[in-house]
UniProtKB/Swiss-Prot annotation:
Alphabetical UniProt keywords: Cell cycle, Cell division, GTP-binding, Magnesium, Metal-binding, Nucleotide-binding, Septation
Role according to the record: Necessary for normal cell division and for the maintenance of normal septation.
Cofactor(s) needed for function: Mg(2+)
Species: Helicobacter acinonychis (strain Sheeba)
Protein name from the UniProt record: Probable GTP-binding protein EngB
PROSITE patterns xrefs: G_ENGB
An example Gene Ontology CC term for this record: cytosol
GO molecular function, one term: GTP binding
Keyword Methyltransferase attributed: no
Coiled coil: none
SUPFAM superfamilies, per the entry: P-loop containing nucleoside triphosphate hydrolases
Stated family: Belongs to the TRAFAC class TrmE-Era-EngA-EngB-Septin-like GTPase superfamily. EngB GTPase family.
Length: 208
């Protein structure tokens, strides 16, 4: 069982020079605006640290969090960071600001060697959107041998049972499923504990 020993906010940044030092392995959370990134991070860390905006795409900062997890089963304690990226597909942003914003994010993902895992949140109700395909392709062009990419489907509990089963069978692997409270809808769907164990495994495979 994984116990969350600590989780806290570090800082927000809109420029590479403002980002905190890379002292631990890092996990990046990315996805379209309004896909549920804040809810996912807060549930994952067991604290309401990530703030969501009522206006999709309003948040223009990369937010950094630190957390310490204790894996009781393996007698292992690990500290790592979570980077919450601004949602993409945003609206009402000037072209110059959009270009500057995208440049910062691309530079951040390209040069920050402490990033070990990319978590791409995808709305289970809207699969195969071009914007998600492009995001996946862009991230995969950046991947080094010590990094991993993982899809995680949000709003899974809003699908009917047939849609859930179809997604579970046909979605590209590897992937995880995030329900509203991470309660398993049946024994074959991952619980919060399984999600945490899976993410920790990826982070520990290529430690900083």
């Amino acid at each position: 069982m994984i116990i969350i020993k600590d989780a806290h906010f570090i800082t927000s940044s809109s420029q590479l020079s403002q980002c905190p030092a890379s002292l631990t392995s890092e996990m990046v959370v990315l996805g379209r605006s309004n896909v549920g990134k804040s809810s996912f991070i807060n549930t994952l860390l067991g604290k309401n640290l990530a703030k969501s905006s009522s206006t999709p795409g309003k948040t223009r900062l990369a937010n950094f969090f630190s957390t310490t997890w204790e894996d009781k089963k393996n007698a292992l304690t690990t500290t790592f960071s979570v980077i919450d990226l601004p949602g993409f597909g945003y609206a009402k942003v000037s072209k110059s600001l959009k270009k500057e914003w995208e440049g910062f994010l691309w530079e951040l993902l390209s040069v920050r060697t402490s990033i070990k895992l990319f978590i791409h949140l995808i709305d289970a109700r809207h699969l195969n959107l071009e914007i998600d395909k492009n995001a996946k392709e862009n991230i995969q062009t950046l991947l080094r041998s010590d990094q991993a990419y993982l899809s995680l489907f949000t709003k899974f509990d809003k699908l009917n049972k047939n849609e859930q089963h179809r997604l579970f069978l046909n979605a590209p692997k590897p992937f995880l499923i995030n329900t509203t409270h991470f309660n398993a809808l049946s024994s074959k769907y991952p619980t919060l504990e399984i999600v945490r164990q899976t993410l920790l495994k990826y982070l520990l495979t290529n430690p900083l």
